[in-house]
């Protein structure tokens, strides 16, 4: 629901900022390593994730939408809540985390406060499944269409097989989507 | 609660846009077939439906309020959640869907990802009951008054019977409502 | 949380309006008898009540804050939800409802759609307890202080007894509150 | 989520104000002793706490962020909800409350409406544990870093031990955080 807040930074704490737009000051939780890049009284854009629980509504914020997207993937993993996800991103940035996953570097993962060896192994397993979708398959357009087909309920393998056959960066998005849908609809014997 | 958002489109993905008003960027899920009509950096009005769950608040958006109304009718059908409803509207627009219902075209309905033959039949049944209310009975004013009487708790048959007797497009809305209510209150032996 | 919305009326239906402020159009449910006093394209102030349920957030709106306050009292009565409360206020305005209560006019109460004789009797009983607090005891200041003392947890009888002793419209609110609290704290043997 | 509202005060009641920003009037519950410092039609900044329940969203407001922070600590104590916390802060301001805790003054605590002797003793016990964190350990920067380390999951003793070793007000926040995290990560044998 809430993609970003653009406003004036009012306060900066190691793990929280207050950013104002209109007459409202929003308090936003941030990864500790990010606070040094945010300055009081400056106009800033924070990419946000609205976390709704039965008795709380909180906003988590990031300087890049790709880091916010990674945060939203992390909290889909069973056992990783917003607090643990922000700990992970407080300790390592996105690129470092990819390397840790690629090198199966359990030791670095378990340096994150609150993460023991067993949790580190489970996170490694789950992140391996997610990270490809967070690194561009081919390019942004290909990825956007693939994720739309997955959201429609098609399996990754099925969607990629069709997309790889017809994908060509010259074609516009709408054409590629229409072609994929008609092949996929046909493939399902519908 | 949220009828529309008027703002500048920041990003357009096949199934999602980000639209900004004030300092806030709202992320809005849209039917895939609609994204080709939305352009980045353009001032746009999106008719919205706020979907509140225990652990999420999401916004679904449409270029026409009638399509948003159809979406809100679809999600009242048991077994059809927002995701399935957006799949239906990603595959077919409103007019096509009416034809499919009128011609009891199960084959086309089951082309929608995630919808098998059995679900298609059930949707057909339920949609037949809803669609009349989404196509104008006589005209907008007649429909608005009828839906207000239904919301007050009167049965469709009872309300239509009274409305058909006294309805005349020349009369203003308040008069028609007052007359219907007094007849309906009288008819209930109250 | 949401006391009022000031904005331009975009659409008026018998039981619903859309009012815009900033780039957001809010959809607000209203009593049917009120829609005739609201005109499209006019700047209007609507006094609101935000109704939060597990799977919905809705706004109910009124042209006067006293009618909104009555609505919020009605929905505190067991068995009366927002829909029934808006039916009551769609059928009768505040003054008429007071007369109905004063004259114990069950017949008029049960003319409200969805309200049978038994419910009418129960509403009558409960409304008798509430209405005094909605009609000014003495004046607005007296009522505001009385309701603040009740919110603090003091019984109506206890609070009125103290307030009646020290109340004088010439004194300012803060002084009256301080004097009442010190007497009440003393009376509790604290 | 909601740190403050800056706007024009529309109404002031003993325990509630309405403050407007943009076209929205927000109703905010305040401690009774604070209302005398708030004037109608004046531009005011209210530090807020958004209280989300299954069937309500309410805003509690304070003239100082430190009083709001104390309110948010109080409601973490089992058995103290927002209503009781606002009663406590309606009866005593922050400084007086500190003295009451320091002097273990049960009598004053139980003067708060709704608080008997037993609850007073329990509150005393719990507040003793919280108050140090609300009074500056050394200075604002030291406190912000300490609370960030606690939020990351480190124990207070462990975090304070490391922070006391390396803390020096000349160093900037980012450096102190980086140094503490590397020592803490090392200390955990990670």
Curated annotation (Swiss-Prot), chains A, B, C, D:
Residues 139-190 are annotated as: Domain III. It is found in: Cytoplasm. It comes from the Bacteria. Keywords: Cytoplasm, DNA damage, DNA recombination, DNA repair, DNA-binding. It holds the Pfam family RuvA_C. One of its GO terms (molecular function) is four-way junction helicase activity. SMART domains: HhH1. Residues 1-63 are annotated as: Domain I. InterPro entries: DNA_helicase_Holl-junc_RuvA_I, Hlx-hairpin-Hlx_DNA-bd_motif, NA-bd_OB-fold, RuvA, RuvA_2-like, RuvA_C, RuvA_C_sf. Homotetramer. Forms an RuvA(8)-RuvB(12)-Holliday junction (HJ) complex. HJ DNA is sandwiched between 2 RuvA tetramers; dsDNA enters through RuvA and exits via RuvB. An RuvB hexamer assembles on each DNA strand where it exits the tetramer. Each RuvB hexamer is contacted by two RuvA subunits (via domain III) on 2 adjacent RuvB subunits; this complex drives branch migration. In the full resolvosome a probable DNA-RuvA(4)-RuvB(12)-RuvC(2) complex forms which resolves the HJ. The RuvA-RuvB-RuvC complex processes Holliday junction (HJ) DNA during genetic recombination and DNA repair, while the RuvA-RuvB complex plays an important role in the rescue of blocked DNA replication forks via replication fork reversal (RFR). RuvA specifically binds to HJ cruciform DNA, conferring on it an open structure. The RuvB hexamer acts as an ATP-dependent pump, pulling dsDNA into and through the RuvAB complex. HJ branch migration allows RuvC to scan DNA until it finds its consensus sequence, where it cleaves and resolves the cruciform DNA. Belongs to the RuvA family. Has three domains with a flexible linker between the domains II and III and assumes an 'L' shape. Domain III is highly mobile and contacts RuvB. This is Holliday junction branch migration complex subunit RuvA. The lineage of its organism: Bacteria, Pseudomonadati, Nitrospirota, Thermodesulfovibrionia, Thermodesulfovibrionales. The gene is ruvA.
